[in-house]
């Protein structure tokens, strides 16, 4: 008996429960200390991947592998169901399972960890058990059939710590393991493939199985507690399995377990939807029985046997049961009633809904049929309701201990004993410490916040993509941009708010985890108490055994037996109540499984959406890189064009400098010529003075001659004295000498005049040459200007096209254009003011020239009038010449020649004055034209520089706008998506939360009812507390071991994740190295590594960084707006430059006209010079005639003197004296007239000289004014150059700021990428963590007292977070 009890305790050493039993197995291999017999063939891997919207898990089971250590689920193995007689092994050939090829999951294994457990082949099984459908799963007992021979000893079960294996993500669970051998002589084990989430009666079933084992060993035939759905069906079904020679144990007859097995249609439909999917994530096929030494119990929580999913397999099992029933003796009435009930249930189970569901399960997709042709006959249904109801072959140790104590020395039936044990165990859960209800709510809130963050991120991505599309087509209007900015700000605020909530909930979760640890500590204390109670039970057993050994039936013993019978009755009643409650719980669990199936579909869709978003993100990044390459190429082309324009401008500046040097040289030459002309004018004035002096002397001689004549007249009248005659002769000689001297002086003056005329002709030749050279230079300059203007026009046209293209792309930059236009308007106003001043100056010069022309015309009229008068005088003199003699004629000719010479001189002077004026005006016009051209060239250079700067800034702005727009659009898309997701998930979570609250209320009511019943079992609880304490100590040790293993696994997973992150970063770095220089990329990689380390250490700085990023984004947006305005202003400047070019063309045409007028003036001046030369020749001829007249007059004087002498010698007045006197008077009158004419000519000459002086003064004033204006223009040019230099410096500064902003944007993008990776990591961690609070209520119930969970379920919950990483 002690062997049996301790064997049971060894079998029960594994803490079991009614949830998913998960264990680490690496510790056993590492330590090399196996803890008992184990069967690696029956270990299964479990991968729980939480990717649902509300964090609900779905399950993927993978078969184990001997090679690798992993997490797994230890699932119950079945023993053969044989009768006690020594019968031969059954014929398994007809039901042997064929080895099947590997059936892989649909999900790719590249994304998930490798399955360390290869799928194994199924051993041939005599009874095909499969997973029961959720509507057909009812409480059933575990069959512990005896061996083929009753004499064989019962082997101990596998030790408490079975070696478990890590689950693979989506590897097949249906691959056959051909390596394992098959033994027909021994029992075979069927590999368990069911992990059901429904609750079952594991404790009672295990107790029944142990009692049946003991009764079989003793030769009795107790009822075997086989409670599968097929065994509960009718035993009167046609006996098809007799043909195959199968023998099974008969179903146990229980009258007290009437359970409703009607299927739930709504749950069935959901499960049907879930199971038709092509992706196989559920349990494997049927179990195969192994040898008893290799047998290992599953860890399901209800210990149910597996079911076939088809009706035929159920009929086969029923037939096996009938065969066993025919071989056994009839059992009591309760068993018969149970058979009747199972028949009714079998009839109900084969309803239309169940058949449709089974038929649908048999219909697989075409792809899976092709993959699984070999295993199509044995393929079983896989559902996500597999995490519960897995239990080892023996039930929990407390139940077995209580059952063994009650069974010792009792004569009651086994059912009553089991009912009493169940009642005792149901009274115990009040000792447990239950955690608060806030854990589930906090977990759900945390999941909700995480989903909201993910949804916001997705919406931001969507919005960024939409904005990218809009940007490629056309720039969006300003209103849309503002609206998007407002939405972005709102989404940022919502993100910050959600993050705050996330942090808050995280803190609350940490507090709740601490509370959970306290609860676990309380649970461990309860377990220690249970162990002490077990010790007490063992002591009581020993006492009973001693009493039995003594023999006899004492009255104490009878009293104890009666008490035990009463306790058994109470236990039976409590078991019935508990069965009803478990049925309700199973129904709710089925509904939960259906919801899990729907969640699985949503998770798959979510994965697809994530893959699609990743692909789209990669495409967007590639497009971004292409756009960046195009922009860089455009920048290079613009820089080359800019350099060309700079070269052209420099060449123009050089040519301008050369032309300015030439103009300065010409001006110096002109000033020298002017000075020479002035010197010549002074010499002419001196000559005129000398001439006046000679004329005065002539007047004096004439006066003397008149005195002589008067004296002659006196002599004629009176007596002529010889002394007076002698004196007269002396006087005449003296006069003649004076005349000779005057003639000599006159010749000298004429020679001087000729010399001056030669110098003037030479000067005129030089002036003509200078004028012709100046004309050639002006023509050359005009041609150069025209060619440069054409080149500038072409360049401006190209720039205009480029600016139009840029304007099409940057229509949104309006404000900056307005500012630029204002500056352009100011410059235009200044130019208009300058133009007005220049026009006023030009108009003043024109007025002055008109005044000078009028004066010259008046002078010409005066000269004409004087010339006409002289002509008249000449006509008169010619009329008088006929009366006069040859002397007279000679004198008249001399006088005419002198007049002509005077006229020629006047004309020459007037021509020279006109030439001087024209040359002065021409020089002034040239200076003005040169100044205008310089101003225009300077303006064009400044405008070119501005255009170049504007183009550079436009290119930079394009890049910045493209980056900013893409970032904003991606963020807005992600925000919108996240908002939508969060709204949907929030509604779903509210519904789930309401349902869970309802379930909690219902559970509370049931708990209150159980607490009322607990009072009846207080006495028995005192005895069992010690045993519970011992058990809690053991579970505490196991939990600590599990926690250490969890920490090791977490460290491993973190290392793997870090390695994966490093690999991803290296790949991204390699992709960027192809685009940029290797040096930059290395620095950026180092920065990224440092940033990652800082981000991992400093979590709290993320929010501050995001705020700074938002502020930077706002500042960048403001900069972008200002740059848009500048771009608009620059485009307007381009238009203004085009208008200015047109104006300059018109001005060039005007200048051409002015040059033509100047050439006409030059031609006129040449004609005037020729006329002056002719007049000079005429004056020379006149001078010669005057000299001839002088000679003739001298001869006449000599003749007169001779006559006077002859007259004096004769001393008699002759007749000719009167005639001579008359002639003398006429000559004197003529001389007087000539003197008058000379006086008038001198006055006119003096007036002309005064006018010349005034004109020279005016010319000098004008020259000074022109120089002043030139200096002012030079100052303006220097100021403009300074402004241009300042503008260039400002542009360089802006370029530096732009580069800095680009660097900051790139750094911000890197930070955002790091944040995204960090958020993903946090999401993964949060997906691992929320499972614990979701199951806190489950942990609160003590599975070792018959509740839904036990310490093993705690380990499963602790390892689920790590299993996520393996599946991911």
Curated annotation (Swiss-Prot):
Region (Disordered): 71-264, 278-312, 1053-1080, 1163-1183, 1308-1368
Protein encoded by which gene: cgn
Keyword NADP: no
Superkingdom of the source species: Eukaryota
Ranges annotated as biased composition (Low complexity): 116-132, 200-211
Family of the protein in this entry: Belongs to the cingulin family.
Biased composition (Basic and acidic residues): 290-312, 1320-1338
GO MF entries: actin binding; microtubule binding
UniProt-annotated stretches for the region Interaction with TJP2/ZO2: 150-295
Task of the protein: Probably plays a role in the formation and regulation of the tight junction (TJ) paracellular permeability barrier, possibly by linking ZO proteins to the actomyosin cytoskeleton.
Subcellular location: Cell junction, Tight junction
Ranges where the record places region Interaction with TJP3/ZO3 and myosin: 9-378
Region of interest: Head: 9-435
Source organism phylogeny: Eukaryota, Metazoa, Chordata, Craniata, Vertebrata
Positions of the UniProt region annotated as Tail: 1331-1368
Name recorded for this polypeptide: Cingulin
Motif (ZIM): 41-55
Biased composition (Polar residues): 83-97, 228-256, 1352-1368
Keywords: Cell junction, Coiled coil, Tight junction
Tissue note: Localized on the cytoplasmic face of tight junctions of polarized epithelia and some endothelia.
Location of region: Interaction with F-actin: 101-294
One cellular-component annotation, GO: myosin complex
Comment field on protein domains: Deletion of the TJP1/ZO1 interaction motif (ZIM) decreases but does not abolish colocalization with TJP1/ZO1.
Region feature (Interaction with myosin): 377-1368
GO biological process: microtubule cytoskeleton organization
Subunit annotation: Parallel homodimer. Interacts with TJP1/ZO1 and TJP2/ZO2 in vivo, and TJP3/ZO3, myosin and OCLN in vitro, possibly directly. Acts as an F-actin bundling protein in vitro.
Matches recorded under Pfam families: Myosin_tail_1
